[in-house]
Amino acid sequence: MRVKLIAVLTLAVSAVCQTLPPGVQKKASVGGITEYEYPNGLRVLLYPDPANPKVTINMIVQVGSRHEGYGETGMAHLLEHMDFIETNDGRQIKNEIVAHGAVWNGTTSEDRTNYYETLTATDENLKWALDLEAARLVNVKINKQLLDVEMTVVRNEFERGENSPQRVLSERVASTAFLWHNYGKSTIGSREDLEKVPAERLGRSTGNTISRTIP
């Protein structure tokens, strides 16, 4: 299944090139935000802001926890964490982001996963950030050693949620409202599923939607 992507770019530019690459279509323009679509289904929302000295790249993958199968709860969120570590050709993703002085993060919800960077607006930084997002989507390294390290981070996040009355309440309400739908399950998943997920399964799929190649 093809993964739907949305790239949201906020640029500090005085003008935007009006000549589109072959196959790219301009879909709509509202309130200064213009939508473009590439032949592969990638959608780009471009928002030029001449007063802003920063550039923001927000990559949205329209796959989230509701796409997880039985025994896969928490895999979308765990994969988001893995997407900040390393590529198969040795790029250290988080280290690169920090070295460029970017404000960055990633989040997982029921319907989507997103990754973003905000950094000084230069052509070099924009090219680097787009290249990084491409590498993150198709070339992330997933193996048992990296998974074991990141599981410590995810496990701590899980335990913090267990001690949050607000999160416990929201999870109880959701599970009652959506008895037979993944909207009723926690995005971070269950401890049982998280503790037993093998690297091969995480790398192969999240709800049979995102494919990876395991080295």
Predicted regions and their residues:
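Sec-dependent signal peptide recognition
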Residues: 2-8
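N-terminal signal peptide c-region/cleavage motif recognized by signal peptidases
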Residues: 12-14
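A ubiquitous, low-specificity "background" feature that marks scattered single residues
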Residues: 10, 55, 83-86, 139, ...
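His/Glu-rich zincin catalytic helix
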Residues: 5, 17-95, 116-121, 127-133, ...
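Charge-rich, well-structured scaffold segments of protease-associated domains
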Residues: 37, 42, 92-215
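Hydrophobic side chains within alpha-helical segments
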Residues: 7, 80-83, 153, 160
